[in-house]
Amino acid sequence: VAFDVPFPPDYGGVMDVYYRCRSLKNAGYHIILHCFEYGRGRMHDFSAIADEVYYYTRSKSLLSWFSKTPFIVATRNSTALLKRLLQDKHPIVFEGQHCTFWLHHPELSQRKKMVRLHNIEWQYYEGLSKRSNSFFKRWYFQSEARKLKRHEETLNYATALATISASDTDYYTSRFENVVYVPVGFEQFPPKLRVKSHDPFYLFQGNLSVEENSEAVHWLLEAFRKQSIPQTLIIAGKNPDQVLVTACSQQTNVQLIANPSDLRMQELMQTATAHLIIGFQHSGIKLKLLNALMTGKKCIVTPEIVAGSGLDHLCTVISTPEELAQNLLSENSLSEQESATQLAEVRELFSEKRLLEVVRKYLFDD
């Protein structure tokens, strides 16, 4: 049961859903995919990851804002979903706390149910409230954080909780039984493209309409300007607002590529001198970090990006604009041997083998 339509797999949460479904289908499982759709469309070919696909609309009732149930849960309360789940006896995977509205329903009490936890939701929303400049958004994030923390008790109805990072595993293990760490599994790595050589550039990529990413871009722009960093910075991603577009246009060594195609983004990631993965809020594991590491390129990150991930030794960790400038001015990219070592370790850490073991043990073994 997915909180969003997992296509295209172009942001963290849906990437995890998409590649996990593909791994399970390739392993011989029959996948019935239930998606809450609210803007990503319903005309997708999911034959590579699912055998059956059903779509549901998120509730838009004003009552959801004032419910004791978290908004992200209350708006995914489809009775059509419950009816379909009751048509068989198959195990169920609920994606995130978002999709747990029916987790404790009495008619599902005998089913094997796993909740895939993409982060500690209440902490994520609490962090958003501290960083937002909007009064309404701060109120909403604070309210949602309180509701999500209370709502965690519903997770006791799950057969197993599958966490995405080591630090999240520690948190949930202290509160629940049957918590198991299941890293993101990428068995098939992106193929190398034949691309023309580029002048050296540093890449920041992400969904630019997300406040956290927009904040990171503005931090980078200020760092490049104040530290007089001469190298080229490319900002690539979806739906930048006009403020960000204007800010990028005011610096001659900064190029903004809005809404690049998947192929163009892949080309940028494989030809960048290094990836700049900047963020100021820890949550789960940043899948764009894994994507960057899989290119075999150097990754320069802030501490929050790698906190609890066990990946800090594969990255260059910086905390200040001065440290960023020092690293960029040295222009030391990874050697071929360092790149090969990085790729080998990422493949080992994020193999799909762990996923298949956990699914078999918790959802199918008696």
Regions found by a protein language model. Name each.
Residues 288-294, 298-302:
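Short hydrophobic beta-strand element within catalytic cores of glycosyltransferases
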Residues 1-52, 87, 225-226, 298:
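N-terminal subdomain of nucleotide-sugar transferases
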Residues 79-86, 121-124, 132-161:
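Membrane-proximal helix-turn-helix segments that form the acceptor-binding/catalytic region
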Residues 16, 181-250, 255-270:
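Conserved catalytic-core segment of nucleotide-activated headgroup transferases in glycan assembly
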Residues 51, 114, 141-191:
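Donor nucleotide-sugar binding/catalytic pocket of nucleotide-sugar-dependent glycosyltransferases
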Residues 269-284, 295-297:
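Acidic donor-binding loop of glycosyltransferase active sites
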Residues 91-92, 108-131:
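Active-site proximal beta-strand in glycosyltransferases
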Residues 76, 333-365:
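A charged, aromatic-enriched C-terminal amphipathic alpha-helix characteristic of glycosyltransferases
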